[in-house]
């Protein structure tokens, strides 16, 4: 039973509970008109302390398509946060008006703090460079829908693996499925964090390797998960400029890939995926964005207990 629960980390739900969410998402995709009034009278609060396009719009569209309403802010300067209000006080106040909240915050752990003080379910919509569990649900639903299974996959993660919260959450989630293998491709300065390597991969005897060239790994991958180098995580502009074009996926590199490999990207992209890949049927990142709305519809319905 997911009613009243928070989603702060992809490990918060068991595999069985994740499957519940995915099955409901399948139903919504199949017959969306059946769910147009599921959340009549319910309100979602979107508390976005960091810029967002896809995640915020996806949450808002999800609630509106369920018949609910949305309140919130898209940057903290438009709220009492600008006056120094704490996360704890903000969520207590928002809980007086809304039935569920989605929070994005630049500080790691801020949504978890909010959940401690909240009377309504809190969804982590991304906290610093830590976790992004609803993007992970999006990724898993996309893979499950297009591949048919989440087991026995070799997943390549490429780009900013140090600050890339979507990668951290995805590795944690897929590590629970049978025979997952990982290949990490990144500049030395942006390697996967030690806590992922030691606490998730090595602790659970999950096979992984790190390579410097994309071409060295492409042939074995079932999934290639591309990420951008995030300018907003750098203190030094020179470092960003030096690293931002380290890995670029283009048609030449795709020649090494399996015919059924999937290219995913949490978006936004900068130039790490060439536009020519948009015409390749293996480029699934815009399908992935659409699945994001459906899985958030299912998640909201489950946490509110209306399904």
UniProtKB/Swiss-Prot annotation:
Binding of L-aspartate, residues: 83, 165, 228
Gene Ontology biological-process annotations: 'de novo' pyrimidine nucleobase biosynthetic process; 'de novo' UMP biosynthetic process; amino acid metabolic process
GO MF annotations in UniProt: amino acid binding; aspartate carbamoyltransferase activity
Catalytic activity: carbamoyl phosphate + L-aspartate = N-carbamoyl-L-aspartate + phosphate + H(+)
E.C. number(s) listed in UniProt: 2.1.3.2
Keywords: Pyrimidine biosynthesis, Transferase
Pfam families reported in the protein's UniProt record: OTCace, OTCace_N
Top EC class, one word: transferase
Pathway: Pyrimidine metabolism; UMP biosynthesis via de novo pathway; (S)-dihydroorotate from bicarbonate: step 2/3
Positions that bind carbamoyl phosphate: 54-55, 104, 132, 135, 267-268
Family according to the record: Belongs to the aspartate/ornithine carbamoyltransferase superfamily. ATCase family.
SUBUNIT field: Heterododecamer (2C3:3R2) of six catalytic PyrB chains organized as two trimers (C3), and six regulatory PyrI chains organized as three dimers (R2).
The protein's role, per its UniProt record: Catalyzes the condensation of carbamoyl phosphate and aspartate to form carbamoyl aspartate and inorganic phosphate, the committed step in the de novo pyrimidine nucleotide biosynthesis pathway.
Full protein name: Aspartate carbamoyltransferase catalytic subunit
């Amino acid at each position: 039973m997911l009613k009243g629960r928070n989603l702060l980390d992809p490990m918060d739900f068991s595999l069985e509970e994740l499957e519940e969410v995915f099955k409901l998402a399948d139903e919504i995709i199949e017959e969306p008109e059946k769910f147009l009034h599921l959340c009549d009278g319910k309100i979602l609060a979107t508390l976005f302390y960091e810029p967002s396009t896809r995640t915020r719009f996806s949450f808002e569209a999800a609630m509106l398509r369920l018949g609910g309403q949305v309140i919130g802010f898209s940057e903290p300067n438009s709220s009492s946060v600008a006056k120094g209000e704490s996360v704890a006080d903000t969520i207590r106040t928002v809980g007086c008006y809304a039935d569920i909240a989605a929070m994005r915050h630049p500080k790691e752990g801020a949504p978890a703090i909010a959940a401690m003080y909240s009377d309504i379910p809190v969804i982590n919509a991304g906290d610093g460079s830590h976790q992004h569990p609803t993007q992970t649900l999006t990724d898993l639903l996309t893979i499950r829908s297009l591949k048919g299974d989440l087991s026995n996959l070799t997943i390549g993660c490429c780009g900013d693996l140090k600050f890339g919260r979507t990668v951290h959450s995805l590795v944690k989630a897929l590590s629970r499925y049978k025979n997952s293998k990982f290949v990490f491709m990144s500049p030395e300065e942006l390697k996967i964090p030690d806590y992922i390597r030691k606490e998730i991969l090595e602790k659970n005897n999950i096979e992984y390797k790190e390579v410097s060239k994309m071409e060295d790994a492409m042939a074995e991958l079932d999934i290639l998960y591309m990420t951008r180098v995030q300018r907003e995580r750098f203190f030094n502009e020179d470092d960003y400029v030096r690293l931002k074009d380290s890995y670029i996926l283009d048609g030449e590199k795709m020649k090494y890939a399996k015919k059924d490999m999937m290219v995913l990207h949490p978006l936004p992209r900068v130039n790490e995926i060439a536009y020519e890949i948009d015409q390749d049927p293996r480029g699934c990142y815009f399908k992935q964005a659409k699945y994001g709305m459906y899985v958030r519809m299912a998640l909201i319905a489950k946490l509110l207990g209306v399904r």
